[in-house]
Structure formats: C-alpha cells, structure tokens
C-alpha cells in the first residue's frame, strides 16, 4: 500500500508545481492583454490544482503521512509554516471558486472573449473576477510555494507514518 501512496504523493507534488507555473503564466498573459492565452493557462492551473487535491486526499486515505523529524529547535518554525499553509489552502478554495464563477458569468453574458467589453453584464462580471483574483492569486501562490517548501523539508527531515 505505501509504495502506491508514495507514487501518488510524487504525482501530487508534480501537479501542484505545474499548477503554480501555469498560474504565473496566466498572470503574465493577462498583463499582456492576451485574454485567450490567459484563460487557457488559468484553466490549466485550476485543473492541475484540482488534480492535486484529489491526489492529496487519496494519499491521505491510503494512510501515507509524513511528520517532521528534524531538529527540535526548528519544529516551531515548521509548525508555523505548516499551519499558515493549511489555513491559506482552506481559504484559497472558495476564493478560486468565486473567481471561476465570475469568469463563467462573464463568458456566458459575453458569448466570447471578444465581446467582454461590449456587453455590460460581461464587463461587470469580469470586473468582479478581477477584484477576487487580486486576493486569490497571492493566496494561491503562497499555498503553492509553502507546499513545495514543506515537501522539501519533509523530504529531508520527514518520517513516514502509517495508520
């Protein structure tokens, strides 16, 4: 059972790394006013983040966990990092869902990316989307980066726990 869970863990790490990269690419594209490329990058980031969540929960269900086994004086810092990661990850899911909802509303009203600015309901929805992602993107990046750091820490100072 554990080797399968370990493979799932590696796949989960790969998906969240790729999700973070796709997120950054999406931010770049929207700053270049490349809406279609932005949309594709963000959908990719969202799908990869969803896949990560499924893999992560599967790994936990299989009983594969790691705990910090490093120097005792570093444990408080590790726990602060871990708790902030967990809290921000919990906040990120609803933030991302609301941002996606406004995207859906805007696209439904506009009919296509080219009509976003011409259809008032679409413009309002995308203005709301923009307001939400100003919070969502930094939280998402924080969660991704702290997740990678936690993974690296546990790779060096982690011990596998089984249930």
Where are these regions (language model features)?
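Alpha-helical membrane insertion/targeting regions
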Residues: 1-163
